[in-house]
Each structure stands twice: as structure tokens, then as C-alpha cells.
């Protein structure tokens, strides 16, 4: 015959089992939710990469996003079999690029101009045939808005011949600005550069031809690109104030991933 002590032990054991079962059920339901989110995110990201291939010039950012997308899908599939320590490591690896992207985004939204500057330097980006890409159009629209507030300034458009282009980036940019109503005589072309560094070096040389005693410039590029380009300008000795242009939301992953690597490369070899 069971004693009162045994009954208490039995009740306690039953309660513990119930708590354990509830906990396991809670974890399992949340595990399914997390896996579903990861799968959805991975496939959505792959679709985004495919779409970006149709509207932009391929960069290492495309490859990075595709690799991360596939990794998310596999992570979701094998989620239950992955040790807790690996889960923690993966979460950290996810947080790092997100935090870095937030930093670049906030930094790129700076507007330090006072609309009395001498020169506007617009950094080149992709050109398809003779048409500017959307990121480049955003940069040029920012330049138009600036010039309308300071029509005494000169605009230097920078960039050589790209992979998908039939004319130089500088020429395509000049045509766009003229189409937007900017007088041709205030537009200066730098059409030899192939990198951001060369953009800035050659643009600086052109600006000094018009302002031999020095000039105050405005640097226009997309928000994600502001940090690295302004640091390069400082390194070269170009006195510019940043003015970030917007970036289409659907191109954030590709552009920010690519820029993250570019910043790391710049920091290592600067």
C-alpha cells in the first residue's frame, strides 16, 4: 500500500513530466516556426538575386547573397540536428552583416552640404548600353536637386566604359543630366576611371584645373557607398562633403553585402 511520501513523489514526478512535455512542445512549435521563416527567407532571397540579375550589373554581392540564401535553406532543413553552440555561432554570423549594414545606412543618410560648394562630384555606377542604371539615376537626381539649389556649382560626372555599356558612364550621366535640364556647360566629364579610387583621383585633377587655389566639393553616391568613398576622399586629400542618394529597397542585400566586403578590403589595405 503506497504511503503518503510515495504519493507526493509520484505527484511531483508527474508534474515534472508535464512541465517537460510542455517545454518540449513549446520548443518544437517554435522550432517549426523558425524553420518556416528561414525557408521562406532563403527562397525569397534567391528570387531577389534572380530579379537583380535582370536589372543590374552582376557583382560579388550577387554571389554572396545567393550563397547566404542557400545556406539559410539548408539551415532550415537541418535545424533540429544542429548543436546549440552552432546555432549561437550562426546567429552571431547573421547579426554581424545586419549591424554593419545598419551602420552604413545611417552613415550614408548624412547631408553635410550647405549649398555654397564649388564642385559636385557624382560617382559612376552601372550603365546598360547607353542608359544609366537605377542606382546611378538616383545619384544623378540628387545632383540635379543640389544644382537647382546652387546653380553656380560645376558638376563632374565620373566613370569609364563598363561591361554592359556602349558608352562611358560619364557620357551616359552627362546625357541624363542634360535631359533633366542641367546646362551642358556646367557638366565636366571624367571618363577614364574604373574604380571608386580612380573616380576621386581623376575628378580631383579636373576640379583643380578650374579651381587651382582649391575647392570645396560635394560627393554624391548611394547611401551604402558614402562611408567608403568619403574615407577614400580623405585619404587622397579631396575636400568633399557627403550627400547620400537613395537606394531601392529590393537592391539592399546585394549592395550592402558587396559594400561590406569592399569596406573590409579598404580597411585592410588602406
Model-derived features with residue positions:
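A transmembrane-helix-recognition feature enriched in membrane-embedded lipid enzymes
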Residues: 252-270
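Perimembrane helix-loop junctions in membrane proteins
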Residues: 52-55, 79-82, 104-112, 270
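Internal/C-terminal transmembrane anchor helices
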Residues: 84-105
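A structural signal for short, hydrophobic/glycine-enriched beta-strand patches
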Residues: 99-258
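N-terminal targeting leaders characterized by basic, low-complexity, disordered sequences
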Residues: 1-26
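Membrane-embedded alpha-helical segments of integral membrane proteins
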Residues: 32-77
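Membrane-interface helix-boundary motifs at transmembrane edges
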Residues: 27, 77-90
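Helical transmembrane-bundle signal
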Residues: 45-48, 72, 97-104, 262
Amino acid at each position: 500500500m503506497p504511503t503518503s511520501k510515495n504519493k507526493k513523489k509520484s505527484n511531483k514526478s508527474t508534474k515534472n513530466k508535464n512541465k517537460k512535455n510542455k517545454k518540449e512542445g513549446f520548443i518544437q512549435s517554435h522550432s517549426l516556426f523558425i524553420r518556416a521563416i528561414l525557408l521562406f527567407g532563403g527562397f525569397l532571397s534567391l528570387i531577389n538575386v534572380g530579379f537583380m540579375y535582370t536589372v543590374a550589373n552582376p557583382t560579388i554581392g550577387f554571389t554572396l547573397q545567393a550563397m547566404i540564401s542557400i545556406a539559410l535553406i539548408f539551415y532550415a532543413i537541418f535545424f533540429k540536428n544542429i548543436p546549440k553552440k552552432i546555432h549561437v555561432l550562426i546567429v552571431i554570423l547573421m547579426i554581424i552583416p545586419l549591424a554593419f549594414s545598419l551602420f552604413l545606412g545611417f552613415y550614408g543618410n548624412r547631408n553635410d552640404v550647405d549649398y555654397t560648394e564649388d564642385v559636385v562630384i557624382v560617382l559612376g555606377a552601372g550603365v546598360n548600353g547607353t542608359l544609366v542604371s537605377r542606382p546611378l539615376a538616383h545619384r544623378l537626381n540628387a545632383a540635379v536637386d543640389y544644382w537647382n539649389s546652387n546653380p553656380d556649382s560645376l558638376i563632374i560626372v565620373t566613370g569609364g566604359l563598363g561591361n554592359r555599356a556602349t558608352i562611358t558612364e560619364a557620357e551616359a550621366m552627362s546625357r541624363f543630366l542634360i535631359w533633366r535640364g542641367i546646362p551642358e556647360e556646367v557638366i565636366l566629364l571624367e571618363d577614364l576611371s574604373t574604380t571608386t579610387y580612380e573616380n576621386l583621383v581623376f575628378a580631383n585633377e579636373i576640379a583643380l584645373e578650374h579651381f587651382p587655389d582649391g575647392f570645396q566639393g560635394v560627393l554624391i553616391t548611394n547611401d551604402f557607398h558614402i562611408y567608403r568613398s568619403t574615407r577614400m576622399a580623405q585619404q587622397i586629400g579631396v575636400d568633399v562633403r557627403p550627400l547620400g542618394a537613395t537606394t531601392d529597397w529590393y537592391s539592399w542585400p546585394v549592395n550592402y553585402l558587396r559594400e561590406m566586403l569592399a569596406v573590409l578590403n579598404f580597411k585592410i589595405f588602406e
